[in-house]
């Protein structure tokens, strides 16, 4: 991978990370088209740190409030009894606990299915299938969902279900935001609430997987045939951070006024295009280096 290709992939990551269209699927597809090979799970996870840093910058005030209220309830003067320590009566502290609960599914599944995630699940036929299925689900759920629950209405049950939706994004093509937004809309959350919860809940998961993949890349730098090198990877990460911040602003404005129908149609169209490219042999279903790593 050269630096121009890294810049393109950084732009693709920024444009698709927050939208319910699956950034990992786009990186997988564009990587094959530009490089002739899969950029790999490590590259994908590390450049996602850039877009997640943009989330932290944009939601910095919310994050500071969540952390200060959570610590104050758990360890400070606000934690008078166990109910208070669990955030009762404090929306920010409760949200902090909900983010923790929502992170449990992806932590468990990410560790237990790590080898499958990095090999078998990167098959483009799987990507095509989930792009299509979750595109239809998003369209149906968004059209029929109630729109009355806000972030403050979240329960531990809802948080866990959000987490299950997020963990589906371990399959390239599902989309982290697509999974959580679909669950959120099915549970009756407004579009704005579902999106903001999706952003905040992704922070621990993305940083956790990104840092783990970075550590693995350092250890296996000379033997990992798929990893494109630190120079291009860091360039792509920086690009995804800068452009990602702009995309967040635009996306939040969009969902305040429009439905997710356009994204659902895009997912279905992309699934059809990728399927055709697979059939005619332009794209391989799975990269040979992924098979070798299995």
Kindly label every feature range from the protein language model.
Residues 1-294:
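Multi-pass membrane proteins that catalyze or facilitate reactions on polyprenyl-/lipid-phosphate substrates
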């Amino acid at each position: 991978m050269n630096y121009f290709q890294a810049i393109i992939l950084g732009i693709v990551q920024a444009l698709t990370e927050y939208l319910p269209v699956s950034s990992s699927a786009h990186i997988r597809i564009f990587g094959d088209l530009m490089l002739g090979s899969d950029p790999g799970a490590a590259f994908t996870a590390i450049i996602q740190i850039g877009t997640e840093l943009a989330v932290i910058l944009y939601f910095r005030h919310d994050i500071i409030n969540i952390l200060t209220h959570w610590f104050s309830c758990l360890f400070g003067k606000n934690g008078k009894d166990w109910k208070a320590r669990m955030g009762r009566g404090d929306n920010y502290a409760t949200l902090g606990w909900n983010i923790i609960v929502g992170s449990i599914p992806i932590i468990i599944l990410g560790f237990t299915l790590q080898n499958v995630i990095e090999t078998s699940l990167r098959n483009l036929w799987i990507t095509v299938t989930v792009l299509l299925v979750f595109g239809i689900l998003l369209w149906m759920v968004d059209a029929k969902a109630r729109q009355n629950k806000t972030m403050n209405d979240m329960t531990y049950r809802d948080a866990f279900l959000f987490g299950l939706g997020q963990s589906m994004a371990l399959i390239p093509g599902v989309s982290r935001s697509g999974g959580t937004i679909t669950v959120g809309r099915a549970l009756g959350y407004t579009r704005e609430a579902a999106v903001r919860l999706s952003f905040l809940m992704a922070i621990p998961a993305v940083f956790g997987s990104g840092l783990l993949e970075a550590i693995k890349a350092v250890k296996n730098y000379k033997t990992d045939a798929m990893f494109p090198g630190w120079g291009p990877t860091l360039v792509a990460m920086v690009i995804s951070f800068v452009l990602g911040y702009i995309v967040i602003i635009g996306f939040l404005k969009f969902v305040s006024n429009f439905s997710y129908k356009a994204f659902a149609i895009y997912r279905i169209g992309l699934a059809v295009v990728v399927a055709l490219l697979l059939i005619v042999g332009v794209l391989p279903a799975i990269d040979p280096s992924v098979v070798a790593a299995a």
